[in-house]
Amino acid sequence: MKKMTINDLIKWKQEGRKFATSTAYDASFAQLFESQEMPVLLVGDSLGMVLQGKTDTLPVTVEDIAYHTRSVRAGSPNCLLMADMPFMSYATPEQACENAATLMRAGANMVKIEGGDWLVDTVKMLTERAVPVCAHLGLTPQSVNIFGGYKVQGRDQEKADRMVKDALALQEAGAQIVLLECVPAELAARITQVLDVPVIGIGAGNVTDGQILVMHDMFGISANYMPKFSKNFLAETGDMRKAVAQYMAEVESGAFPDEAHTIA
C-alpha cells in the first residue's frame, strides 16, 4: 500500500471513485486495515464509548487521542490518519493550534473538528500553520447536550440550507475534507455536489465520496447499540479481514449503504 495523501482523495472525487474508511484505536487493528489497503483511518473520540465505556464522547482528552494516534500510526504507516479534536480542545483558534500540534506530532496527518461556520477562523489558523482539517457537520456528538440526544440533523429546509452554507464556508477557510453524520441522503448529495473537497458520510446515504463506520459496529461488537446506518460485516463473512474487504468493496461499488442503512 502506497502512502496516502489528501491529493489522492481529491483525485478520486474528481474520478468518481468512492472509498471506505474506518475508525481505529490500536496497532493490531490498524495493521489489519492496512493489510486490506484501507486508505483513511480515524482515531475517533468514539473511543470514549467503545473503549472506555462512557455514555458519550465528552470525557475524552487530547492525551487519550494522542496515545491512540501513536498506536494506530505504528500499525498503519501508510494510511491518511485523521485524529479527533476532543470536546473543548479547540474553543479558541490558539487552543486549537496547540492541541492540534500534539496530535500531529503523535502521527496524525489531519485533525477533525466538529461545528459550523463559527469554526472558520480556527480552520484558517490551523491550515495556515500546516495542519490539515476535516470539518464534521450534521450530528456532531460533542453537541449531544445541545441537541438533546443523538438525532438526525438537517431535516427542515432552513437547517439544510444552513448546513450547505457552513460546508462551503469551511471549505473556503481551508478544510480539506468534510464529514457528514446522520443527515438526510438528499442533503448529503447536495453538499457532496457543491463541494470540491471529498465528503465522507456516516448515516448520510451512498452518494458521498467516502463512507466511514465505527470499527466496533463494522464487526458487530458494540456493547449496547447498533445504529441503523451501520452493518455487521463480520456476521456475513466470519473473518475480520474478509469483513473489511467486503465493507470496502460494497462502498466502492455503491452497494453500501443501501436503503435499509440510509436516513431518508
UniProtKB/Swiss-Prot annotation:
GO MF entry, a single one: magnesium ion binding
Organism (species): Vibrio campbellii (strain ATCC BAA-1116)
SS bonds (residue pairs): none
GO CC annotations on file: cytoplasm
Functional note: Catalyzes the reversible reaction in which hydroxymethyl group from 5,10-methylenetetrahydrofolate is transferred onto alpha-ketoisovalerate to form ketopantoate.
Binding site for 3-methyl-2-oxobutanoate: D45, S46, D84, K112
UniProt keyword Glycoprotein present: no
EC number: 2.1.2.11
Comment on bound cofactor: Binds 1 Mg(2+) ion per subunit.
Entries under InterPro entries matching the protein: Pantoate_hydroxy_MeTrfase (IPR003700), Pyrv/PenolPyrv_kinase-like_dom (IPR015813), Pyrv_kinase-like_dom_sf (IPR040442)
Keyword Cell inner membrane: no
Subunit structure: Homodecamer; pentamer of dimers.
Family named by the database record: Belongs to the PanB family.
Listed pathway(s): Cofactor biosynthesis; (R)-pantothenate biosynthesis; (R)-pantoate from 3-methyl-2-oxobutanoate: step 1/2
Entry's Gene Ontology BP terms: pantothenate biosynthetic process
Protein's recorded name: 3-methyl-2-oxobutanoate hydroxymethyltransferase
EC supergroup of this enzyme: transferase
Domain of life per record: Bacteria
Main location: cytoplasm
Active-site positions on this chain: E181
